Amino acid sequence: VLSSADKNNVKACWGKIGSHAGEYGAEALERTFCSFPTTKTYFPHFDLSHGSAQVQTHGQKVADALTKAVAHINDLPNALSDLSDLHAYKLRVDPVNFKFLSHCLLVTLACHHPEEFTPAVHASLDKFFSAVSTVLTSKYR
């Protein structure tokens, strides 16, 4: 459960990301594909090379979903319901992949914002990404 301090940390950190969210989303996806090659199986139609337009576009989608989640941090299930349906019923993404992407998002944010990435912010973002992952996998059976 996200505490008030966690929510404040997440909002403050995400606010500093600003216009770089899509760039960081794409970088985190690239890290995920490199570090966890089995994740590539969900994107057989993508050009997964560094900087590809398809990875950039999907990175922006990831960033947009996380931006929406931050904006609705007190009601993640309703905010992410459509995305949860998509991943559970249509895409059927293995839930472990959300953990992989979450880890790569943390690494990416730490690389770009080391001064803001305190232990408290790290813990808050980790809890937030975990909460988002839980919502996205809540409709799996």
Swiss-Prot record:
Residue(s) carrying Phosphoserine: S3, S35, S49, S102, S124, S138
Purpose of the protein: Involved in oxygen transport from the lung to the various peripheral tissues.
N6-succinyllysine PTM sites in chain numbering: K7, K11, K16, K40
UniProt tissue specificity: Red blood cells.
CC terms in the record's Gene Ontology section: blood microparticle; haptoglobin-hemoglobin complex; hemoglobin complex
Entry's family note: Belongs to the globin family.
Protein name (database record): Hemoglobin subunit alpha
Keyword Transport recorded: yes
Chain positions with Phosphothreonine modification: T108, T134, T137
